[in-house]
Amino acid sequence: MEKLISVAVMRASDAAEIAGGTDSKTLMYRAGLGLFQSWNWHGRIDIVTGSGNNAGDGYVLALLLHQHGIPCRIVRTTEKNSPDGGYFFLKCEERGISVTDSIDFSHTDIIVDCLLGTGFRGELRPAMRQIVEQINQSGASVLSVDINSGMNGDSGEGFCVRSDRTVSIGCLKYGHLLGMAQGKIDSLYNYDIGIPCKGSYLPLFSGDTGAPENWDF
């Protein structure tokens, strides 16, 4: 049984887990592993990143793809990183994973949307809206990390990336399933990274955390 919670509850649960002794980079690794396991990876893969922890999840995914001999490209929209995201980005650079700041999806088969997380509120800035429009018009398959970039995690409102699949991290958020998210998420998958969350229950298929914890790439 899945839990359906607010963004604030997820954030507090995440903070409590870290305060209790779980390494935040371990949680980020688990999230990236959930992404890796949730898709049939093939063709040209672009991992489009912003500045937050969603980007860090994408960097872990890039490392796992590289580890399994699957080429990918990181498309950075900013040079800023969260502390944990920066750690995994340096690992990507050390391994020679392709990195670009050019937004061109004309030959892309799969786009991984790691731009904005569940904390986003309000309207997209013009530059970010343009990137979202380019993703939506690309014709590529799209996987969104935790929430579709631009979507309000509590209400489902907002101009946002349209995904073929969204992989929620930890627990489902209200915004994933409210009516305003209709037409924006084609399929929804939740990956449990081992954070206890308080909330109402909803039946939905979920991944698990049964994989090894070794993220020393």
Language-model features: locations:
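Nucleotide and nucleotide-moiety/phosphate-recognizing core
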Residues: F36-L115, E123-V145
